[in-house]
């Protein structure tokens, strides 16, 4: 009976002048049949096959060993999932009380890392998604984009940087790149560089007109890779048109959330107990004109228009949840396919949205504000090296995605990149990559609104309507995480939401106890505006204009 002994490399000791021949086995390195066998005397190797077979085995082994020593580690696949308009508070991983059912997104959160501090930097346009998607593609800050108001200043905004965007970088690195997403409101020069591209705006309630269309494009692409036996790593930009309005859900999911695709502008939709409850920071109107009169998202969205009554808002939340669950179904299809192909374990998955959404919170409907429900975005990462069930602050911007994807794929980030890789957060080395966050919305009247956050404190300031409205809103999130205002204490509002704000849960601008903190936050905001080349100044700031851009601006 031949005796096989499994050995570690370097374990064999041979007489002088003899060398071991080692074949790679399924689970370990062995001296095996066809080369030589250890028998009872571990100091002597006894040939057991004819010389020709032995020489053949030696040659095969040598080639195999050489190939193994030079083989590069398998590069990760990347699945980047991007929704259009989703507040993090819709998801159970951010709001356990949410009735929205997204089992596949929930599983990504359980098996990956949830970011509590992920933000889009803001917008100078009512179409917030346009600069947001430019920032994702380019890794550049909001004031340094090719479409920025400062684009005429070439030193701030290089115009032709499509070749330094995600698809171009990954194409050159040998990745297969594929994209499906809504049509328009993004960086077209970059979008057309994906090797495979299927863009169309799909916000209907059928398989052909809704999110299943995007899902089918990804499923077809994966099936084709499987048929061709492709080994090239892939980057899939898996974008959805929902839950952006018009939120026409499928009949089954609308019924689940008690909603209808309401089209009668003259009356509110019918009440239904299945509809989601009003959020705790709901208001029937915003506290003041927030500076963008006639804004489409606030007055023209089908099913809502300018209404903020309970029935309208709860129905619209139900529609949004129906659309979001349909997106989750499509994500589940892709994950199952990757699992069946044996690719899931080597795939890094990012889940996020281009921006958040209000839908009744603070009396607003759209995405043109800087409250947490809209300035923040959901952000989940699952993949090799990411600790399951982990949660971090992160303090990332969407513009950090490019640098991070490059870092994870071992691709040098381009010189045009301004973002910071958060790979050290994903690997557990850090909890966050910055301590200060800046936000802007000035798509209406100028200078518009600005925000800054550091630690538990956040400041929003408004300078709108030709200076007729100037408001300051400092919040302490440790005490007031929902950014509740005095208006939230109104009995009619409390009766609708069931949420009774505590005495300290309000705008702290007039509180003398926090005057020093307010001054500190105002100074911090000005410093960020200067550092990031914000071209405007608020009423209480020096009119110093632009400062030269700093190295690695956007960090």
Question: What feature does the model see in each segment?
Answer:
Residues 74-79, 111-116, 172-178, 229-236, ...:
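Loop/turn elements at helix/coil->beta-strand transitions in domains of secreted/extracellular proteins
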Residues 1-45:
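Extracytoplasmic
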Residues 102-103, 136, 182, 345-350, ...:
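Polar, surface-exposed loop/tail segments
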Residues 131-234, 246-254, 258, 429, ...:
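Catalytic-site neighborhoods of secreted/periplasmic enzymes
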């Amino acid at each position: 009976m031949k005796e096989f002994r499994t050995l570690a490399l370097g374990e064999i000791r041979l007489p002088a002048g003899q060398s071991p021949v080692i074949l790679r086995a399924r689970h370990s390195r062995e001296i095996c049949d066809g080369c030589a066998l250890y028998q009872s005397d571990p100091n002597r190797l006894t040939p057991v096959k004819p010389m020709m077979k032995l020489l053949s085995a030696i040659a095969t082994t040598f080639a195999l060993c050489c190939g193994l020593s030079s083989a590069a580690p398998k590069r990760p696949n990347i699945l980047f999932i991007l929704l259009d308009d989703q507040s993090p508070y819709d998801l159970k991983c951010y709001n356990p009380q949410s009735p929205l059912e997204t089992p596949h997104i929930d599983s990504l959160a359980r098996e990956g890392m949830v970011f509590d501090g992920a933000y889009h930097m803001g917008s100078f346009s009512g179409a917030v998604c346009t600069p947001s998607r430019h920032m994702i593609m380019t890794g550049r800050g909001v004031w340094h984009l090719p479409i920025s108001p400062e684009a005429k200043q070439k030193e701030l905004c290089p115009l032709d940087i499509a070749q330094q965007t995600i698809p171009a970088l990954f194409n050159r690195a040998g990745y297969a790149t594929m994209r499906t997403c809504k049509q328009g409101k993004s960086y077209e020069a970059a979008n057309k560089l994906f090797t495979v591209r299927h863009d169309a705006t799909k916000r209907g309630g059928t398989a052909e007109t809704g999110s299943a269309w995007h899902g089918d494009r990804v499923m077809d692409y994966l099936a084709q890779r499987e048929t061709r036996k492709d080994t090239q790593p892939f980057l899939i930009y898996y974008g959805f048109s929902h839950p952006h309005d018009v939120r026409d859900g499928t009949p089954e999911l609308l019924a689940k959330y008690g909603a209808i695709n309401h089209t009668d502008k003259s009356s509110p939709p019918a009440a239904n107990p299945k509809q989601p409850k009003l959020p705790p920071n709901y208001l029937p109107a915003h506290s003041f004109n927030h500076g963008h009169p006639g804004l489409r998202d606030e007055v023209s969205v089908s099913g809502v228009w300018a209404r903020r009554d309970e029935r309208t808002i709860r129905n619209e939340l139900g529609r949004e949840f129906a659309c979001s669950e349909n997106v989750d179904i499509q994500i589940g299809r892709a994950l199952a396919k990757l699992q069946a192909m044996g690719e899931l374990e080597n795939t890094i998955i990012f889940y996020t949205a281009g921006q958040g959404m209000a839908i009744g919170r603070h009396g607003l409907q759209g995405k043109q504000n800087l409250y947490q429900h809209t300035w923040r975005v959901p952000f989940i990462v699952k993949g090799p090296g990411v600790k399951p069930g982990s949660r971090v602050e992160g303090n990332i911007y969407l513009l950090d995605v490019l640098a991070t994807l490059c870092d994870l794929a071992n691709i040098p980030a381009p010189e045009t990149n301004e973002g910071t890789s958060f790979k050290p957060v994903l690997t557990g080395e850090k909890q966050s990559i910055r301590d200060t966050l800046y936000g802007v919305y000035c798509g209406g009247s100028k200078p518009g609104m600005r925000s800054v956050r550091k630690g538990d404190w956040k400041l929003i300031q408004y300078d709108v309507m030709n200076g007729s409205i100037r408001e300051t809103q400092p919040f302490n999130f440790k005490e007031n995480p929902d950014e509740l205002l005095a208006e939230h204490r109104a009995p009619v509002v409390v009766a609708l939401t069931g949420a009774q704000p505590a005495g300290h849960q309000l705008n702290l601008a007039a509180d003398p106890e926090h005057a020093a903190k307010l001054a500190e936050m105002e100074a911090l905001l000005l410093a960020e505006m200067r550092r990031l080349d914000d071209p405007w100044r608020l009423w209480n700031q020096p009119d110093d204009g632009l400062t030269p851009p700093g190295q690695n601006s956007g960090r």
